Amino acid sequence: MYMRKLILALILGIATANGATAQTRSDLRDSLSAAVQVLAFHPDSLELRMKKAAWNIELEQWRYAQEEYDFVLRCDEKNIAALFYRAYVNERQGRYKFARLDYENLLRIVPGHFEAMLGLALLNQKDNRPTEAFNQINTLVAQHPNNAVAYAARGGIEIERKM
């Protein structure tokens, strides 16, 4: 039941974040300010912290987003959304080892998670680990043979490696 609520919150957060792309940066900052004010009264609200982190990402405030995901993961170390997005934030900050750890922890919780496997493969390519990247992307293609994104990612890695 808790996991369903978490997934619903994740979907709602993503929908909110996707809808926010049409907003101006000023509107995003206003939403973020409102979230900060509400957080002052409900500092333990993980859902609100996840939303705040999503707005931080939209505004490219990587450090603030990371702090929110750190808080969520201290309270719920198996929060799938927080692990995934913190990995993304760490990657954007150039903290590849931390991003790799988050993707690997996520894959321990949800083996075969498509986005985490893809993120890890692309991270390894970016971090000059070509053998690991290619092995991981091939595993991804083998596990998801009907997924065009997996093939496109493998094609991108092959082009970068001049294969």
What is each residue range found by the language model?
Residues 46-47, 80-81, 114-115, 148-149:
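Helix-start (N-cap) detector for alpha-helical repeat units in TPR-like alpha-solenoids
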Residues 58, 92-93, 126-127, 159-161:
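Register position in tetratricopeptide repeats
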